[in-house]
């Protein structure tokens, strides 16, 4: 999330005329890094849409009433209305990034519109 946080902060600070839709997944609610900051930006800057999903809500200490499950092609289709003129940025552990590239491929999103960064070690 850290690279995306920096990109979003820059866009908010400069009030850029660009649309950003962050789809952010964690295992449990307690793992949502920068949650308050992201929510504040989404409320105060109309160009940011924020969707957060939890994959294991039953294991968390905090209740979760939002999206559940992994980010996959079905969830992307549900949340993103139009794939034209969009660039998809993906970062995270290698297996997750690979799964996201496959999901985007199933949606016929060309690899030229997908930017990835794999973080190892977690």
PLM regions and their residue ranges:
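Hydrophobic/small residue at the entry helix of a nucleotide-binding pocket
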Residues: 2-3, 96
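Histidine-anchored nucleotide/phosphate-binding helix
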Residues: 3-13
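Reductase modules of NAD(P)H-dependent flavoproteins
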Residues: 12-13, 18-122
């Amino acid at each position: 999330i850290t690279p995306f946080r920096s990109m979003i902060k820059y866009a908010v600070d400069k009030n850029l005329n660009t649309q950003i839709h962050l789809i952010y997944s964690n295992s449990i609610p307690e793992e949502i890094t920068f949650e308050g900051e992201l929510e504040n930006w989404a409320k105060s800057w109309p160009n940011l849409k924020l969707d957060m999903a939890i994959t294991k809500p039953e294991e968390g200490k905090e209740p979760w009433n939002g999206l559940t499950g992994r980010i996959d092609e079905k969830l992307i289709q549900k949340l993103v209305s139009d794939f034209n003129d969009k660039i998809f940025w993906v970062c995270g552990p290698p297996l997750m990034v690979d799964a996201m590239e496959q999901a985007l491929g199933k949606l016929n999103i060309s690899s030229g519109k997908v930017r990835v960064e794999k973080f190892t070690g977690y």
